[in-house]
Amino acid sequence: MTQRFSFELTATDGRARTGVISTPRGEIRTPAFMPVGTAGTVKAMLPENVRATGADILLGNTYHLMLRPTAERVVRLGGLHRFMNWDRPILTDSGGFQVMSLADLRKLSEEGVTFRSHIDGSKHHLSPERSMEIQRLLGSDIVMAFDECPALPATEEAVAQSMRLSMRWARRSREAFGDRPGHALFGIMQGGVTRDLREESAAALREIGFEGYAIGGLAVGEGQEAMFGVLDYAPGLLPEDRPRYLMGVGKPDDIVGAVERGVDMMDCVLPSRSGRTGQAWTRRGQVNIKNARHMDDPRPLDEACSCPACRSYSRAYLHHVFRAQEIIASMLLTWHNLHYYQELMQGLRTAIAAGRLGEFVAAFHAARAEGDIEPL
């Protein structure tokens, strides 16, 4: 890999930005939504189908992959891209959030975290250095610094201590990452909903220096108003010439609001998880295809959508296969949801480039306010 990681802004509209991240494995158009392939797969989707929705990049999970099948096995089999048959960019998270939310018997220290697997109870250790090693073995294009995610609710003092530990770990992550042309390391801003802590965290990250910067510690139950309150200032604390990644977001209206406030990248399990439970995201809002009102409805889920679920199947069929618990139900609705999310991102990119984001956002909210079509 001789090409280096780079980011070019091509247009702005207010605080919103559009641009291109260039990597040796391809370009990522921003604002970008990254489907989540937790264990090396986006559930219910083939990689080529994920690409067909318009996705430029996938997210993989360090915690899950280190436990099963293990990073050492993945590298012996040619790296994560070959292993999961995805030749485009991959971002891997550091494992910190999952250690705090999933693992058992955690023991946190300055060195790192010792924990037991939620799968089989086996004992493991994650540190900034080990997280960087695992992500190097996986071969991800964008690597996330190892951070600590405090359980909420937490006192401001606890959030401050956690943030400062994460900043020390960020420096160790930077040192352990080394010089890897073509790959990028992103630092993660923490600090909860307290502006002083966010400013302190951003200053520490800028001093260390990263190829991109993430806003962590949001979308963890604080509510949209509080999240947007942080996003009103947090992106502006980060370097303008580097990508800004909001972790774990989210619902379509969260995404639109984040883009308006200067965010370039997002990820969330929501579209795929919702698809597996019969929840469809459409331009008119959310639709529960399992509701009886769809049982005899010959119309598509969304007549303006070109995904296979809308192009070739009726609401009645989708209702039937969910009620019958057929595998195709999860496949079709996951494809639809990911397609809708990528269409939303393309609409945002086009609107920003044309200087018409305000019109796009107004139309987005107006369509959702109308709600789903009337039953037959």
UniProtKB/Swiss-Prot annotation:
GO CC terms, sorted: cytosol
A biological-process GO annotation: tRNA-guanine transglycosylation
Leader sequence residues: none
Record pathway: tRNA modification; tRNA-queuosine biosynthesis
Cofactor: Zn(2+)
Keywords carried by this UniProt record: Glycosyltransferase, Metal-binding, Queuosine biosynthesis, Transferase, tRNA processing, Zinc
Binding positions for Zn(2+) per the UniProt entry: C305, C307, C310, H336
EC number of this enzyme: 2.4.2.29
Domain of life of the source: Bacteria
Catalytic activity: 7-aminomethyl-7-carbaguanine + guanosine(34) in tRNA = 7-aminomethyl-7-carbaguanosine(34) in tRNA + guanine
InterPro entries listed in its UniProt record: ArchSynthase1/Queuine_TRR (IPR050076), TGT (IPR004803), TGT-like_sf (IPR036511), tRNA_ribo_trans-like (IPR002616)
Residues holding substrate: D93, S94, G95, G96, F97, D147, Q190, G217
Cofactor descriptive note: Binds 1 zinc ion per subunit.
HAMAP family: Q_tRNA_Tgt
Similarity comment text for this entry: Belongs to the queuine tRNA-ribosyltransferase family.
PANTHER family per UniProt: QUEUINE TRNA-RIBOSYLTRANSFERASE
Binding partners and assembly: Homodimer. Within each dimer, one monomer is responsible for RNA recognition and catalysis, while the other monomer binds to the replacement base PreQ1.
Protein's name according to its UniProt entry: Queuine tRNA-ribosyltransferase
Organism expressing this protein natively: Cereibacter sphaeroides (strain ATCC 17023 / DSM 158 / JCM 6121 / CCUG 31486 / LMG 2827 / NBRC 12203 / NCIMB 8253 / ATH 2.4.1.)
